[in-house]
Amino acid sequence: FQHIVVFPGGNWIPKLWSDKNYNIVMKSLLKKYNNIKFILVGSAKEKENYYRNLVNGIDEKLIIDLFGCNLTLTSAFMKKSDLFLGNDSGLMHLAVSNQLRVISLFGPTDDKIYGPYGESNVVIRTKENLDYFKSIHIDANKSYMNSIKTNTVIDVIEKLLK
């Protein structure tokens, strides 16, 4: 099996991509590849917020639930995984430190400053650039990540899985 670590959470709502989008990506990959398992990571609170939508329609045997686990265990699983998909977050940096290939989603934050370092890592940005985000009042209760399309993320993952 190839293991893809998925982190839908983060500490700021404006930079969170929808859990339903992650679910679409996961289900699409499972239609094309029969050797993928998903390792879901985050806090216990994030599990409450995202788990149901994340795993909707996915066989539980293909899910490894690490929500609420400590960083040591999460890090150990990352070391044995093939890919990380997630928002701009501390767990994204933990994945980088474990030499995991990272696909990180960015919107209102600067990927040149906060993005994953390393040649093999990929940043997918919203179509809105940083100047746009600097020019508006950011509502802390609203996601600004909706211009990232699931097909874009799927295409990037498929290139990295080859």
Where are these regions (language model features)?
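Conserved donor-binding/catalytic core segment of Leloir-type glycosyltransferases
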Residues: F1-I13
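Leloir-type glycosyltransferase catalytic cores
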Residues: E119-K162
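Short, Lys/Arg-enriched, disordered terminal segments
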Residues: F1, K31, N35, D59, ...
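Short clusters of hydrophobic/aromatic residues that line enzyme substrate/ligand-binding pockets
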Residues: L66, Y114, M145-I148
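Gly/Pro- and small hydrophobic-enriched strand-loop and loop-to-helix capping segments
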Residues: N98-T126
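Glycine/threonine-rich flexible loop motifs
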Residues: P14-S18
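Flexible, glycine-rich phosphate/dinucleotide-binding loops
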Residues: I13, K47, D111, L130
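Donor-binding and catalytic core of enzymes assembling or modifying cell-surface/extracellular glycoconjugates
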Residues: D19-G107
